């Protein structure tokens, strides 16, 4: 008797998912809530990143967990509450970054294989969750777009670090590209100039000068080779040239210092205080290093520094909105994305 034994071959491979290209906009991050608990969770993740605080030794860990996370969250929660989008129960940074992604996607509807998403380096939606979601949607190629015009290890590099951590755990990794800084791109400088001029046209006063305030960083980071300061200078030089302003009319300063180390100078708050004491009565401040309005622009500049200016003799103060999801702002991001997608489209 002949026995026929069925031969089972390997299971058929799953049907291929249509190949797509993912575009992921990434900004710094935000708490999930504006209460002390939410801010503490956010600050713990942010301040535990060795790209942000490079000396993560025992002294720092003791200070972070013993002092900072027990005192700073309550103070910062009050600041977040001043600017919180209560309708959506989220920070303005989250609202704006979502809008940027949606408007960028709308401008790319003729590219049906492009999938646009957004993430935060700290907080939610996390880089991990959005990269995994893009891969699940069939994105075999991924363009990560750090929304920082000027490069720094504490911003752009940590986005790359986290993206690669996520990829390291994937069996099927997408091909990855990261957009470069765009601190001197013509589209970016033109958009800044247009935004400044449009805002000034709405004011009932003419500023005597404009302060260009960038997020600060420890001077030691620059001495180790971080190009951030030189790129901030290059941005302001290009903006001065574009607007026909000299160094006395468009000043460069650095804000948001933290801790006791020396940070990049001149400091924004000290400069604004001195300008008022020296007789400047009408002032405008622009924040070219921020792609989106956030705590540092809406609270620190538009409220805290406005109060400093008025308290020391100033009379008129205006914080110029960031590019956000304006037409010019989206055009800057779109040009950057399309340039870096060459060869993939």
Swiss-Prot record:
Top-tier EC class: lyase
Keyword Lyase tagged: yes
Pfam families named in the record: Ferrochelatase
Pathway: Porphyrin-containing compound metabolism; protoheme biosynthesis; protoheme from protoporphyrin-IX: step 1/1
Major localisation: cytoplasm
Residues involved in Fe cation binding: 215, 296
PROSITE patterns found in the cross-reference section: FERROCHELATASE
Localisation per UniProt entry: Cytoplasm
GO molecular function: ferrochelatase activity; metal ion binding
Keyword line: Cytoplasm, Heme biosynthesis, Iron, Lyase, Metal-binding, Porphyrin biosynthesis
GO biological process: heme biosynthetic process
UniProt-listed Enzyme Commission number(s): 4.98.1.1
Gene Ontology terms: cellular component: cytoplasm
Catalytic activity reported: heme b + 2 H(+) = protoporphyrin IX + Fe(2+)
Function: Catalyzes the ferrous insertion into protoporphyrin IX.
Protein family (similarity comment): Belongs to the ferrochelatase family.
PANTHER family cross-referenced by the UniProt entry: FERROCHELATASE, FERROCHELATASE, MITOCHONDRIAL
Protein's recorded name: Ferrochelatase
């Amino acid at each position: 008797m002949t026995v026929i034994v069925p031969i089972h071959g390997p299971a058929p491979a799953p049907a291929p998912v249509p190949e797509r290209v993912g575009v992921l906009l990434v900004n710094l991050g935000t708490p999930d809530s504006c209460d002390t608990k939410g801010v503490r969770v956010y600050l713990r993740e942010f301040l535990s990143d060795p790209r942000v605080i490079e000396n993560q030794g025992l002294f720092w860990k003791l200070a972070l967990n013993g002092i900072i996370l027990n005192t700073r969250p309550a103070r910062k929660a009050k600041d977040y509450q001043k600017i919180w989008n209560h309708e959506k129960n989220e920070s303005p940074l989250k609202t704006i970054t979502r809008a940027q992604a949606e408007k960028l996607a709308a401008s790319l509807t003729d590219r049906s294989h492009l999938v646009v998403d957004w993430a935060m380096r700290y907080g939610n939606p996390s880089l991990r969750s959005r990269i995994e979601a893009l891969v699940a949607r069939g994105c075999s190629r991924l363009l990560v777009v750090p929304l920082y015009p000027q490069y720094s290890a504490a911003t752009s590099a940590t986005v790359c670090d986290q993206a690669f951590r996520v990829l390291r755990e994937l069996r099927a990794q997408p091909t990855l590209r990261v957009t470069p800084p765009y601190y001197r791109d013509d589209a970016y400088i033109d958009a800044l100039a247009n935004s400044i001029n449009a805002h000034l046209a709405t004011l009932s006063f003419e500023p005597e000068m404009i302060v260009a305030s960038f997020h600060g960083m420890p001077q030691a980071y620059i001495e180790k080779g971080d190009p951030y300061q030189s790129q901030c200078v290059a941005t302001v030089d290009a903006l001065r040239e574009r607007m026909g302003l000299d160094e006395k009319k468009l000043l460069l300063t650095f804000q948001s210092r933290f801790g006791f180390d020396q940070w990049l100078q001149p400091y924004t708050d000290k400069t604004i205080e001195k300008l008022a004491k020296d007789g400047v009565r009408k002032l405008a401040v622009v924040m070219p290093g921020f792609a989106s309005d956030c705590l540092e622009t809406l609270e620190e500049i538009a409220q805290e520094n406005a109060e400093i200016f008025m308290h020391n003799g100033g009379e008129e103060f205006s914080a110029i909105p960031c590019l956000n999801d304006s037409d010019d702002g989206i055009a800057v991001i779109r040009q950057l994305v399309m340039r870096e997608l060459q060869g993939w489209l």
